[in-house]
């Protein structure tokens, strides 16, 4: 979905009925804003449409809506969806095959963005990077086309959702660390956090939601009422915020700060900002797509996106920004809800499945570490042990 304000001048000029010179072309956009709502099913656009009044409503009303635009990738998880979004590369080409998997070369589990050659900035431990991404992204191509004279920034709660869409040549990717209650980055991008990031973190935005009461934004006879109180502060609050609308509000506020500090839209070539709202995914996994909480998250992220679009209009003016909105994947109903509908299914913890594989192979071929690792797709078997038998 893209904002359509760029067409207005050309259409008005073409409508004039008297001869004149070649009409002036509309000004080129100065900023591309690529927005992902994590785990946002397409039917949320129509199911909750009557209650949208912010950014989603604006994009639906004034943008182009592509009802059948999708990639048929597997697995449908955050890392894969975010890597495809601005690269167009399927997992077999991008190298991003899951959120995490077993790397046979390293003989251990890795994540899509883990990188022990880097350090976390703003927190403790190894950093993250796009080094496992084998494809270029839109941001990389914009950097190449402008000979480096543009800015590319990625922002999200999750490291992979900030890093993978923004690509290799990004000027920075930032994500929220619940251990620190702050936005962090990696030495892959720079030696220390920019001053504006340190200033934002110093304001301790997460603490402002201590003891906040999350209640439905709009009542509905189809959904039950709920009340959820946030912890008072500290790490307990930071973790709880991730599965609440307040996390998206913090991400939006950080995006506004990035636009000003990085002068996005103020360079000779068009800049790019990739923003992923991840809190919807955390709530969806906990509560399921049929829940009142998921509905409320949709209505509230609509407001957050609307706030961001209004900020962009004030800073850059109408028609100078191209906005794209998509999701990285959807979600199936909770097994318990399916059971109520007399549908087959259920829950089976991954450990139970892996232990069953391990036990079956040990019983048939003898003791040994038969299962070397795992991913969403299944188990990785120990090839060396198999060869030795």
Tell me what each language-model feature is:
Residues 29-41, 59-60, 85, 142, ...:
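Beta-strand elements within well-structured catalytic alpha/beta cores of enzymes
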Residues 170-254:
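Long, well-ordered, tryptophan-enriched scaffold segments
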Residues 18-64:
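Active-site-proximal N-terminal segment of extracellular/periplasmic enzymes that hydrolyze or transfer
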Residues 46-93, 151-155:
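Short, structured active-site-proximal loop/turn typified by the sulfatase FGly-forming signature C/S-X-P-X-R
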């Amino acid at each position: 979905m893209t904002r359509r304000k760029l067409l207005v001048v050309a259409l008005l000029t073409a409508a004039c009925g008297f001869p004149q010179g070649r009409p002036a072309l509309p000004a080129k956009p100065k900023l591309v804003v690529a927005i992902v709502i994590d785990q946002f099913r397409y039917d949320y656009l129509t199911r909750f449409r009557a209650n949208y009044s912010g950014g989603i409503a604006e994009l639906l009303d004034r943008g182009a809506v592509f009802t059948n635009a999708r990639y048929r990738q597997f697995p449908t998880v955050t890392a894969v969806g975010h890597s495809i979004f601005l690269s167009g590369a399927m997992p077999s080409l991008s190298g991003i095959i899951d959120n995490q998997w077993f790397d046979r070369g390293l003989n251990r589990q890795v994540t899509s963005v883990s990188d022990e050659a880097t350090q976390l900035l703003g927190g403790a431990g190894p950093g993250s990077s796009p080094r496992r991404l084998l494809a270029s992204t839109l941001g990389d191509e914009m950097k190449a086309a402008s000979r480096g004279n543009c800015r590319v920034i990625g922002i999200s709660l999750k490291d992979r959702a900030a890093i993978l869409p923004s690509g290799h040549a990004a000027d920075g990717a930032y994500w929220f660390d619940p251990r620190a209650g702050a936005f962090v980055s990696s030495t892959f991008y720079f030696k220390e956090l920019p001053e504006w990031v340190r200033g934002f973190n110093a304001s301790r935005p997460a603490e402002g939601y201590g003891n906040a009461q999350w209640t439905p934004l709009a009542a509905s006879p189809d959904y039950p009422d709920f009340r959820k109180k946030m912890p008072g502060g500290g790490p307990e609050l930071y973790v709880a915020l991730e599965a609440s609308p307040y996390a998206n509000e913090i991400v939006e506020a950080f995006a506004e700060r990035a636009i000003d500090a990085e002068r996005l839209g103020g360079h000779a070539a068009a800049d790019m900002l990739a923003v992923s709202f991840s809190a919807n995914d955390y709530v969806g996994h906990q509560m399921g797509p049929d829940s009142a909480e998921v509905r409320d998250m949709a209505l509230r992220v609509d407001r957050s996106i609307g706030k961001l679009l209004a900020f962009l209009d004030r800073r850059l003016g109408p028609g100078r920004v191209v906005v794209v909105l998509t999701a990285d994947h959807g979600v199936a109903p909770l097994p318990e809800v399916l059971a109520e509908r007399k549908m087959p299914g259920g829950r089976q913890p991954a450990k139970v499945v892996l232990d069953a594989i391990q036990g079956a192979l040990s019983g048939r071929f003898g003791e040994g570490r038969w299962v070397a690792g795992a991913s969403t797709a299944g188990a990785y078997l120990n090839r060396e042990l198999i060869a030795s038998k």
